[in-house]
Regions:
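Terminal leader/tail segments of proteins
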Residues: 2-7, 19, 52, 117
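Proteolytic processing junctions in secreted/extracellular precursors
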Residues: 3-5, 9-16, 126
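Cleaved targeting-peptide boundary
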Residues: 16-23
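Acidic, low-complexity, intrinsically disordered interaction modules
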Residues: 41, 45-124
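C-terminal basic regulatory modules in eukaryotic proteins
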Residues: 124-131
């Protein structure tokens, strides 16, 4: 194996760390996410005067969990020990929290939301794919 192949293999092993941490913490709590990927055209990561790019986002949801509020808070608490919590909002019907892994890298920002909507309760995760 050459040096380039070892570096590429290491990049593959470390890719998806946030998503695997969220998935592992959710499984321990009893949350089963339905995983979807959506694409968004944005210039959030390139700069205000530069051309935008297509960015893939992981958009996971668990529809109709048993105790959405306690499970959502437990997931936020589990992730708070490892990631920096930027914002925590509480609403009458739920709440949300915004986390970041590295402050210098905006692609490592992700959101956990839990609420009761008109269509039923849900818990969701949204973040850049591959982070």
């Amino acid at each position: 194996m050459g040096v380039n192949q070892v570096i590429k293999l290491k990049d593959l092993l470390t890719e998806g760390k946030i998503t695997s941490d969220v998935d592992r913490a959710a499984k321990k709590i009893g949350i089963k996410f339905k995983k979807k990927v959506k694409t968004k055209f944005t210039n959030d990561f390139t700069g205000p005067n530069e051309k935008g790019e297509n960015v893939k986002y992981d958009s996971w949801m668990d529809y109709n969990p048993k105790n959405y509020e306690s499970q959502g808070r437990a997931l936020v608490d589990a992730l708070s020990s490892k990631y920096i919590r930027l914002k925590h909002n509480t609403y009458a019907s739920g709440g949300s929290a915004v986390f970041i892994n590295r402050k210098k890298d905006p692609k490592t920002k992700f959101t956990i939301s839990y609420a009761r909507s008109m269509s039923g309760p849900y818990i969701s995760y949204e973040g850049v794919k591959g982070q």
